Amino acid sequence: MWFRSLAVSACTVGVLGALSQKFAPTALFHSAIRKSSLVEQSDMKVELLPALTDNYMYLLIDEETKEAAIVDPVEPQKVVDAVKKHGVKLKTVLTTHHHWDHAGGNEKLVKLMPGLTVYGGDDRVGALTQKVTHYNTFKVGSLNVKCLFTPCHTSGHICYFVTKENSTEAPAVFTGDTLFVAGCGKFFEGTADEMYKALIEVLGRLPPETRVYCGHEYTINNLKFARHVEPNNEVIRTKLAWAKEKYDNGEPTIPSTVAEEFTFNPFMRVREKSVLEHAGTSDPIEAMRSIRKEKDGFRVPKN
């Protein structure tokens, strides 16, 4: 795998709107220049398309058939432009959840590109044509897509796990606002028990090499909180220094891998002694509840 900077796009500041502002923590990239990136494998390509202030859309391309899917296309024109640039056939929309900053472009995109199948796990998803639930499967070209039901951030949240039969390349998972690099989404419509199941029992059981493509660029702030939870974790400090360098270059910190998340993400590490001690409990689910509540009120330090 390698990354190639493709284009520079300015953050769309002020477009997010009141609804999406409610759902997002303080953005790190309000006025920064952010680059899209292309992750290339022999079986699939994934183009990271920055959107709004800190969102990511993902153009998933099957290399065998040149069929494509778009994940959370909140800025439809950027999607249309990327599809034309790659010369692929866009047939599918993968919606992780109904919040405006993820599903808010669906209606416009289906007008710009008629005939799209729009997948999602919630009737609140705009332009929905195919409602899915846990372990539903379908194809994007020759790629296999498995739906993973991960309720908590919203009650209908779906992550999409993508593999290619007989491929030696790493799988991909598009996690929306369930799993971030070094973090997880707020529990707007769920409980600590549900997030524990989503992170540990569902996403955490994917192959460790699985590449994690999340919904937002929150990595630096997440790692600063992780450092607060585990001040002696050198992996966190190293990852934070790396993320700051990426930020300074306007580059994404995505993807991570499932294996990596278990080394620096406090919400994936709720069974670790250091995290349990920080939370003052021996119960991982109570630790999940405690550190999520703590992070909701966490004042991010400058350094």
Curated annotation (Swiss-Prot):
GO terms for biological process: glutathione metabolic process; methylglyoxal catabolic process to D-lactate via S-lactoyl-glutathione. Keywords: Cytoplasm, Hydrolase, Metal-binding, Mitochondrion, Transit peptide, Zinc. Thiolesterase that catalyzes the hydrolysis of S-D-lactoyl-glutathione to form glutathione and D-lactic acid. This is Hydroxyacylglutathione hydrolase, mitochondrial. It comes from Danio rerio. Binds 2 Zn(2+) ions per subunit. Belongs to the metallo-beta-lactamase superfamily. Glyoxalase II family. Its cofactor is Zn(2+). Zn(2+) 2 binds at residues 101-102, 177, 216. GO terms for cellular component: mitochondrial matrix; mitochondrion. Its EC number is 3.1.2.6. One of its GO terms (molecular function) is hydroxyacylglutathione hydrolase activity. It comes from the Eukaryota. InterPro entries: Clx_II_MBL, HAGH_C, Hydroxyacylglutathione_Hdrlase, Metallo-B-lactamas, RibonucZ/Hydroxyglut_hydro. Substrate binds at residues 186-188, 216-218, 292-295.
